[in-house]
Amino acid sequence: MQVTDARNMSAAEIAALMKKKAFDEVELSPRIQAGTDAMFGRHMTAAQVVDQIVADVRKNGDESLFYYTKLIDRVELTSENIRVTEEEFAEAEAIVKPEVKAALERAIANVMKFHEEQMPKTWLTNRPYGSLLGQKVTPVDSVGIYVPGGTAAYPSSVMMNACPAKVAGVPRIVMAVPPGKDGKVNPNVLVTAKLIGVTEIYKMGGAQAIAALAFGTATVPKVEKITGPGNIFVTLAKKAVIGHVDIDMLAGPSEILIVADDSANPTYLAADLLSQAEHDPLACAILITDSERVANAVGEEIEVQLAQLPRKEIAGTSLQQAGKIILAKDMPTVIEMANLSAPEHLEIMTKAPFEIMPYIRNAGAMFLGAYSPEPLGDYYAGPNHVLPTGGTAKFYSVLNVETFMKKTSIIAYTAPALMAAADDIITLAEAEGLQAHANAIRKRVGK
């Protein structure tokens, strides 16, 4: 990889360098665009494809759900085989290696324990004249978890969505996962779901799955909220159904940004950049450093490690399209560039990472020090890996227990408390021209 020398760039040039496309500005690759055009018989943008699929599934239910699954995934679904059966769970458990299951159990325990610390509480507080004010915290009635398929299977996505939903106490947790070409779900994904206690799983993916969860079909009952990452079609579908259901966030391709100084190990840096680049051709991997030696060494090391990867074609395309090694003039500039980027994953690989951390304002998750690589958060440590992307860490938060909960205000006034507040309430209601509001107070206090 080539190094971009930003040491003499102006603030405007740096801002332009760090600017990202919004998720809905990302163009389909030529291969995917050609495949989409062939499927639909005409040129269509990703947004047009999603609008058509969502509208059709909303109108026709199962008929369109099954039609698009056959068209896109090449799998024949029916109302009899769309839901994962007990036999399929048993088959998956027989296939998954014992060491994989044991690792999943330990990872699930870590994720559950971390999210238990996040649990908000219902509370009440005493106010003058015996009144009570408070907040009631309640889980949503149902949630649909989307687990990506495509070029890899992600049991970790099951963990990161289902564990906080379980901790929150959501009564009905549904999972949608694209079926493989054989019409089955990856066994590691099924075993992970079963270990957490999620057994309502539908073999469906893409925009058609999001629409089915949002509006319901004869076979797939609707949910109140949809969470989980996916490709551009899934994200656009989530955007399209907002208001009919709630969603967690609008996420784009995966990202990593590493802040490094001269103490950082180039081998570690290259490995961590590649760990995200292998996700997706659209993934973004960026290193920003104030060390020319580190910048050049990482560029060379990436070429060595890339050649050895099974997914080198995907990782190579990602690095070519969105990978960057940026040489900045000093560490304050490195930090400001990181804040401008607002990355999904931010690694701080410096001599004193905890001295850098307070200056980071925008990041989905931070990984501090040489022994906190991003995959640790992906699989095992406990904090959630469903994170804001595309710069949205400036205003979105990581998926957490409160994602699956609602807060309801509680107001309980006594007669003396209402009498004490009556004049102010009546004055404010009349100032807004809402006489009936004022009357609701007057009828109670005799004014």
Residue spans of the language-model regions?
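Conserved small-residue-rich beta-alpha loop and adjacent elements
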Residues: 125-191
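General beta-strand structural signal in soluble alpha/beta enzymes
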Residues: 123-126, 145, 175-177, 200-206, ...
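C-terminal core of ALDH-fold dehydrogenases
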Residues: 340-447
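Flexible, glycine/charged-enriched surface loops at secondary-structure junctions
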Residues: 120-125, 246, 283-288, 308-319, ...
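A conserved active-site cap/scaffold subdomain adjacent to cofactor or substrate pockets
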Residues: 249-321, 325
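N-terminal Rossmann-like NAD(P)+-binding subdomain of aldehyde/semialdehyde dehydrogenases
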Residues: 1-141
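Conserved NAD(P)+-binding/catalytic subdomain of aldehyde/semialdehyde dehydrogenases
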Residues: 195-268, 272-275, 279-284
